[in-house]
Amino acid sequence: MKERTFKKMIFAVFCCQFLSIPLFAQQQKVDTTHTYSIPEITVSDIYQTREVRSTAPLQVFSKDALKNLHALQVSDAVKHFAGVTVKDYGGIGGLKTVSIRSLGAQHTAVGYDGITLTDCQTGQIDIGRFSLDNVDRLSLNNGQSDNIFQPARFFASAGILNIQTLTPQFTKDKKTNIAGAFKTGSWGLVNPSLLLEQQFNKTWRMSVNGEWMSSDGHYPYTLRYGSAEGDLSSREKRKNTDVQTFRAEAGLYGNFSDKEQWRLKAYYFQSSRGLPKATTFYNDHSTQHLWDKNTFIQSQYKKEFSQQWVFQTSAKWNWSYQRYLDPDTKNSLKKTENSYYQQEYYLSASVLYRLLSNLSFSLSTDGSINTMNADLNNFVQPTRYSWLTAFAGKYVNDWLTISASALATIINEDVKKGGSAGNHRKLTPYVSAAFKPFHNEEFRVRFFYKDIFRLASFNDLYYEEVGNTQLKPEKAKQYNIGLTYSKNVCPFLPYLSATVDAYYNKVTDKIIAYPTKNLAVWSMKNLGQVDIKGIDITGSLSLQPWEKIRINLSGNYTYQRALDVTPPRSKHV
């Protein structure tokens, strides 16, 4: 269900013109020079019309839609988006990343309550650690959102997955909400969760939620010892696939007025996961293990000074820890054990100016400091200083929507040991438009173009024997043209919508692992060009055979072709 919020300002003098007001002995005089405001009105709309009107492909799952998917994690729900590949490394407890239109997980940003998540070590975000129990809305943007009032980081990727968590809602007579859930399933899955929401007064609200998940992952499989008919086979169970995770979140919400809000969120996550090895004949021994911890605190403040000027700011501190253990390594210590630490300090500020009712501009600037350390010998201990500034504009009328932006990126890197990867300066543009050729039909033609890049991760740059500090940013150019249509057909078919988008992505200076001296010695290189072509089709309809019964149907189709078009001579350099 889609919700839209309207804030209306009315003059008392207008009420006097249209309302008949009885006269009493002591009639209260109305100050006609003062502007009176009515409380915020929330209007609910059954159908998703924003996706059809957007200038770039947008897909949304509301809270009700997520319930109908019967998904356990965010990664399960994201698989239902068109043009998306969820890469699953290691099954139940493994890393799960999202890639949009074959560009790779490093080109896809993940936002959590309006602030992006980061991992400078790998450049990839594990979306498998987010549950759907406290998610209010999932949205996926290709290219860029039509919302120009957002942090600069939201302009700095080829696409973004937005995770919006629940905001406490209360009835007039109820100030406390408590909800619990217990899920269980195959392979020893146990998943309890608890949610507590409290309203202190009209201004302050709080929410606390947590969950624990455990699974042994011992799923059965058949191991065949030959391909010919009659060859031996045996029934086995996967080993070292256990996983235990714990997540806790706390939020404080300050609603000072309809024009001023503040939000504070604290997040903690930890996991313990077995790392199963490849299945081989007569050897199922596997003991590798991985431990993860992550915590962050983020704050957001928004103030609407007038109908023309709006300001918002965000701040975040993030800390993460990872420990890897292989007790069967053949070395003098008889094990391999490494620990990695990351920290981030992030600050953002944005201002929106509405020049006209249908023309607005925004300016956003973000600054961040990312550090990494490890218990490895001679580890370089890199630090990345990032400064992003985005200037954007948007024009909207009944038949045309145009959005454009320019992102300036400044990156400085420093290390305590060895050589650093150097600094980067780049300006990247974006433009999109949607045109409605017929006045009485919700039919639109849309297109967008975006020039973007992604930096090499700390692992790509500094990992022992594999890292390469000479790596250049991996660049991507995106082209998209599409058609959208929606219609209220009849009482039996109250809603019908469809979108068709064709796209072309060109990736240059692709960062890949490449063998150097022999197949046992690899290094990271800018060696590759990729052409990506595809079509995304989505459709949804709503049937209402009876007054109190509604049937919603939706589906999507994706065709992708990604080709390595690197010149043959370059491959042997």
Please annotate each region the language model reported.
Residues 75, 79-116:
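Extracytoplasmic beta-strand/coil segments of soluble accessory domains associated
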Residues 357, 399, 497-506, 523-573:
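Gram-negative outer-membrane beta-barrel transporters
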Residues 217-219, 228, 234-247, 253-311, ...:
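Flexible loop and strand-edge segments within Gram-negative outer membrane beta-barrel domains
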Residues 356-505:
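Structural signature of Gram-negative outer-membrane beta-barrels, strongest in the C-terminal barrel
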Residues 132-179:
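A beta-strand signature from Gram-negative outer-membrane beta-barrel systems
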Residues 34, 150, 168-176, 202-203, ...:
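Short loop/turn motifs that connect adjacent beta-strands in outer-membrane beta-barrel proteins
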Residues 308-324, 438, 445-448, 474-533, ...:
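Membrane-embedded beta-barrel scaffold of Gram-negative outer-membrane proteins
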Residues 39-67:
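N-terminal periplasmic "start-of-domain" segments of outer-membrane beta-barrel proteins
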